[in-house]
Every structure is written in structure tokens, then in C-alpha cells.
């Protein structure tokens, strides 16, 4: 759905292919450059993304997704690997207007040195060190506003948080994903800096009065680290006493 909006409204994103079965997906690998990115097209708690450095890794990813590792998979996405740095850009919407809601960067790989499998996030900091006024304007004008135009075209009067997952390549933003919620662990670094009562913001969204709310922030940096069970994001023990 997101990629369809990107195509129609010319939102910058990685080139991609969508596949409904293993055979077609594996056939596509023959013409793929590596590394490549393979994504499960369903909810996977942030763990359904594979960065594959060769065809064998890509085949394993395709098999795991279509074999139901993240639930029933009707299709998957194979897309171009963008060599940049990820950033999370948050906005909040009342169906008429929107306001920016700070930025963050999370660290998705399970091991030190950006190694290992992707997770839901092993830690985050806010604001993103990448953000600047020029980049912020590009994100709003090239990605956020066209997306809202696209949603309106589908008859959606969107209200709530929009989490825009971006890859920043030489100060240019490319859309990786959207979530219609705040990110975690990103929210743990963003919300402590919020000075405005969040209930006031939510009420304004419900009543389409967001334009009348002044969202204020403390001028501080914030950082969080995730503690997880041994073995995560694969098989791991739950309900361990800390």
C-alpha cells in the first residue's frame, strides 16, 4: 500500500518488486544486486526485515517469510538497498492539519557494531543527529505532504501519529516505511522531552483543533537502551524475573 502511494505521488523511495510466491521471488533474485532488502508484508514487531548480502541469504529469507515465520504471508517485498543512515521522523495529525513531533534514531541490529539480525530496536536517541532545517523541509514537502494527499485520495481523513521511517542519503530523504503509531523504543526518548500536556494534544486531534495547540519541547538530548532476553530476536525465554 505504501509503495503504491509512493509510485502514484512520486514520493522518493527505494526501487522494489512485490511477489506473491516463492518461485517468482527467487527468480527475481537472479537479476538483483547485493546487498538487497527483503521484507515481510505484514506485522512482524520490527523483525520482518532482512538485509541479504548474497543470493543464499535471500533464499533463506524468502523461505522463512512464506513458511509463516511472521504469520500468514500473502506477499513479500524485495527492494533496493539504500546506503545511508536511518532516521525516524514523527508527525501528529488531526485530519486537517499536522505538526512535527520530533525525530529519533534507533539501533535495530541485535549485536554491537551494527551486527546481527534486525530487532524491534535495541536503543534509541533523540533528536536525530542528521536533522537540519533543509532536511526537515525536504521531508515535509517531498514525503509528508504528498502522503497526506495520497491518503485523501483514498478517502482517508487521517488522525493520530504518523511514524515516517527514512533512509537519509547525502541529506536526501527516502521513505522506507510508515507506521500509524509512535515507534518504540523511539517514544521512550521523545516523550520525556515533551513539555505540553499530551492529553491536550490528543484531545485537539480528536476535535480537529491541533492548529490551536502549541507543542513545546525541552532543549535536551535523550537516550534509552533496551534490555532483552538472551536469544532475542530468535527463540528466547519470557517472563524472566529481573
Task: Tell me the role of every PLM-derived stretch.
Residues 38-41, 79-80, 215-216:
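Short beta-strand
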Residues 1-32, 36-37, 44:
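Conserved N-proximal alpha/beta basic substrate-recognition cap immediately N-terminal to
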Residues 48-188:
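Internal nucleotide-binding/catalytic subdomain
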Residues 39, 120, 225:
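Residue-level signal for inorganic ion chemistry
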Residues 2-3, 25, 58, 119, ...:
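A general structural signal for well-ordered alpha-helical segments in protein cores
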Residues 24-27, 57-60, 232-236:
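Short, conserved charged micro-motifs
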Residues 33-53, 190:
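Conserved anion/nucleotide-ligand pocket segment
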Residues 140-162, 179-242:
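Active-site "cap" helix and flanking loop/linker of ATP-utilizing ligase/carboxylase catalytic domains
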Amino acid at each position: 500500500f505504501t509503495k503504491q502511494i509512493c509510485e502514484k505521488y512520486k514520493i522518493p523511495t527505494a526501487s522494489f518488486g512485490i511477489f506473491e510466491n516463492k518461485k517468482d521471488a527467487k527468480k527475481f533474485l537472479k537479476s538483483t544486486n547485493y546487498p538487497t532488502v527483503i521484507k515481510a508484508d505484514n506485522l512482524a514487531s520490527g523483525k520482518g526485515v532482512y538485509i541479504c548480502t548474497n543470493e543464499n541469504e535471500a533464499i533463506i529469507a524468502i523461505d522463512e517469510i512464506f513458511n509463516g515465520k511472521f504469520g500468514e504471508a500473502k506477499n513479500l517485498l524485495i527492494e533496493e538497498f539504500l546506503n545511508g543512515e536511518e532516521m525516524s521522523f514523527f508527525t501528529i495529525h488531526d485530519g486537517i492539519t499536522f505538526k512535527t513531533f520530533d525525530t529519533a534514531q534507533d539501533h535495530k541490529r541485535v549485536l554491537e557494531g551494527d551486527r546481527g539480525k534486525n530487532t524491534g530496536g535495541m536503543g534509541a536517541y533523540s533528536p536525530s543527529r542528521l536533522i537540519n532545517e533543509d532536511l526537515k523541509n525536504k521531508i515535509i514537502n517531498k514525503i509528508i505532504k504528498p502522503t497526506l494527499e495520497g491518503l485523501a485520495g483514498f478517502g482517508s481523513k487521517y488522525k493520530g501519529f504518523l511514524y515516517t521511517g527514512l533512509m537519509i542519503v547525502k541529506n536526501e530523504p527516502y521513505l522506507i516505511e510508515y507506521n500509524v503509531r509512535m515507534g518504540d523504543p523511539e517514544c521512550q526518548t521523545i516523550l520525556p522531552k515533551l513539555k505540553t500536556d499530551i492529553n491536550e494534544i490528543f484531545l485537539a486531534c480528536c476535535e480537529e483543533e491541533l492548529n490551536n495547540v502549541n507543542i513545546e519541547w525541552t532543549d535536551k538530548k535523550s537516550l534509552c537502551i533496551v534490555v532483552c532476553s538472551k536469544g532475542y530476536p530468535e527463540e528466547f525465554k519470557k517472563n524472566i524475573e529481573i
